[in-house]
């Protein structure tokens, strides 16, 4: 159904994932103020994977690309790195949606682990090799672990 024929409340709800994605990449929230040193997770990864997997057509790839550009500007990374990562997460989620006959939360969850491992290694390999950015591997390990664990609750 076209977006113009929907009632206003359904239009607003259909834009919810996009708005939430842009809020999450703009604010770059962290739990540093709680003095939890290694507690961080990538909420945009969870959001992009979930809505690419479950919400067909709700998350436009162009808007995901622009969210990655905004994330690069906010964090201070080279432009386009986060966009490639976000779009590769979309590709993995769409692949899983197309091959799945019966959805299962546990299978989706472990495929999400595979996805964030591949995309994070791709992301950090490019950043380290080409742009000589220092990476704290403990933070990266805990970030992937907490992102994986929190996907189950979102």
Locate predicted features.
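Terminal, non-globular segments
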Residues: 1-154
């Amino acid at each position: 159904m076209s977006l113009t024929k929907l009632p206003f409340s359904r239009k607003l709800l259909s834009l919810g994932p996009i708005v939430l994605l842009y809020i999450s990449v703009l604010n770059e929230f962290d739990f540093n103020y709680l003095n939890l040193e290694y507690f961080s997770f990538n909420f945009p990864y969870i959001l992009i994977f979930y809505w690419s997997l479950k919400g067909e057509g709700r998350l436009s790839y162009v808007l995901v690309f622009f969210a990655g550009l905004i994330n690069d500007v906010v964090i201070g990374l080279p432009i386009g790195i986060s966009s490639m990562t976000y779009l590769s997460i979309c590709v993995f989620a769409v692949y899983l949606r197309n091959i799945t006959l019966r959805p299962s939360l546990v299978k989706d969850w472990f495929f999400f682990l595979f996805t964030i491992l591949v995309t994070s290694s791709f992301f950090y390999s490019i950043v380290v090799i080409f742009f000589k950015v220092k990476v704290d591997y403990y933070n990266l390990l805990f970030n992937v672990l907490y992102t994986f664990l929190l996907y189950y609750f979102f």
